[in-house]
A protein has these predicted regions:
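Acidic-enriched catalytic cores of C-N bond-cleaving enzymes acting on peptides and small amides
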Residues: 27-36, 206-214, 221-233, 238-247, ...
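Acidic/histidine-rich catalytic neighborhood of metal-dependent amide-processing enzymes
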Residues: 149-152, 156-237
Length: 423
């Protein structure tokens, strides 16, 4: 169940568009970059209420993507009108260019005062996956608030980011903010179904214009609270790479029959055994010298003894930390390629033994592995002698760009410099 903190929009505003944050130093962090906020970051009670209501309203618009050719276009059009109403300053500011791309996606170009600086891009998406009413405490498109949480499809994926970005820009503009560095805001309408008419068309448009970006900030990770045992405070995990994926279809073909005289093995039984092997044989743990290790080292002083000792001396305790990361399903996903059986299809009648059984397994590929490597391991584990791997959707994991990270840090430091104020 998606249950983000109500103040997530405010936090997104501060993090994404540079309303200065003041971090607590324990002696391990450089204090040189800590300074007074360039623009006051306090929100009035009226603004806080408006943030909540804006997110609730966005959740109530059922912008569902079922397939690349089956979208709720009525809701997508309604959402376009909704953001115009909720964020009027964004749409009327002279140095912001707004374009509709692919009918329902939105591209904002925010022109900065220094054109020599390379621009960056903030990403979010409008569409959500289908949400059957079953399993929800409240209707999935109600946007209801209970006990400090807002419920509904899109509260985490990904209308929280979308509304947070636009809310941040709206509030900054009201405070007479003009950025030094130009940036883009791209809001796709079909991200959940591969983004063919949204993200891909926005990308093609910017490529045709010769735009080169310093870095991109996408929907990223969550605010973790209680997921890592021993961590005393909530923390925001900044994702610096993107997992790849393979949606691998497995199929078993056998001779059909009648349930009154079943064979020793059936298509369903053979396939069930294959996917069970995949679930019981996880991909290798890739915890090593990458950003996950660096993040834990930075968090070391937030833990009590002896965890802080382990994390501060990773050269000695890395194998132990690696095993501990596997024990929690959230942190386990950070150290390996994950395996998730998401679809299983077979059978037409209760007394007929089906000839065909199909399953789709979703692998989210760790950046330290390749699509080919995961495909080989998966097919070997699934026993391809009796289980045929068929067509699959895949995308390559992104690499960690040190240059992009440096540009991102430079931009964050710019946000703490002397403000440029406009009319």
């Amino acid at each position: 169940m998606a249950r983000p903190y109500i103040c997530l929009l405010a936090l997104a505003a501060m993090l994404l568009l540079g309303i200065a944050t003041i971090s607590r130093s324990r002696g391990l962090r450089d204090k040189a970059h800590q300074s007074a906020p360039r623009i006051p970051s306090q929100f009035s009670q009226e603004e806080r209420v408006a943030m909540k209501e804006a997110l609730k309203g966005a959740i109530q618009i059922p912008t569902v993507s079922f397939s690349p050719k089956e979208l709720n276009t009525t809701a997508l059009a309604e959402f376009g009108e909704y953001i115009r109403k909720v964020f009027p300053t964004v749409f009327k500011t002279s140095f912001i260019r707004h374009e509709v791309v692919g009918e329902y996606s939105h591209l904002f170009t925010v022109h900065g005062s220094d054109p020599s600086l390379q621009p960056y891009m903030l990403l979010a998406h409008i569409d959500v996956v289908p949400a059957p009413d079953e399993g929800w405490d409240v209707p999935p498109f109600s946007g209801l608030e209970r006990n400090g949480f807002i419920y509904g499809r899109g509260t985490i994926d990904n209308k929280n980011s979308l509304m947070g970005i636009l809310q941040a820009l709206e509030l900054l503009l009201i405070r007479n903010y003009i950025p030094r560095r130009s940036f883009f805001i791209a809001l796709g309408h079909d991200e959940e179904v591969m983004g063919v008419n949204g993200a891909q068309k926005i990308s093609a448009l910017l490529q045709a214009r010769g735009v080169q970006l310093a870095f991109i900030v996408d929907e990223g990770s969550f605010i973790f609270d209680g997921f890592i045992p021993g961590l005393k405070n909530p923390f925001a995990m900044v994702a610096v790479s993107q997992k790849g994926l393979i949606n691998l279809m497995l199929q078993v073909n056998t001779t059909p029959g009648h349930s009154s005289a079943p064979p020793k093995e059936t298509s369903i039984g053979i396939l069930a055994a294959a996917v069970n092997r995949l679930e019981q044989t996880p991909m290798p743990n890739m915890f090593g010298d990458g950003p996950m290790k660096m993040a834990l080292q930075e968090l070391a002083n937030e833990f009590s003894f002896p965890t802080n000792l382990f994390l501060s001396n990773m050269w000695l305790f890395r194998p132990l930390v690696s095993r501990l990361m596997e024990r929690n399903y959230i942190t386990n996903a950070l150290v390996r390629t994950t395996t998730a059986l998401t679809m299983f299809n077979s059978g037409i009648k209760v007394n007929v033994i089906p000839a065909v059984a199909q399953a789709i397994v979703d692998f989210r590929i760790h950046p330290a592995q390749t699509v080919q490597e995961v495909h080989v391991l998966a097919t070997q584990t699934a026993d391809t002698i009796r289980t045929s791997p068929l067509a699959s959707t895949c995308s390559t994991p992104s690499t960690c760009s040190h240059r992009a990270s440096a540009s991102c840090m430079e931009s964050m430091r710019e946000s703490q410099s002397k403000p440029t104020r406009g009319k």
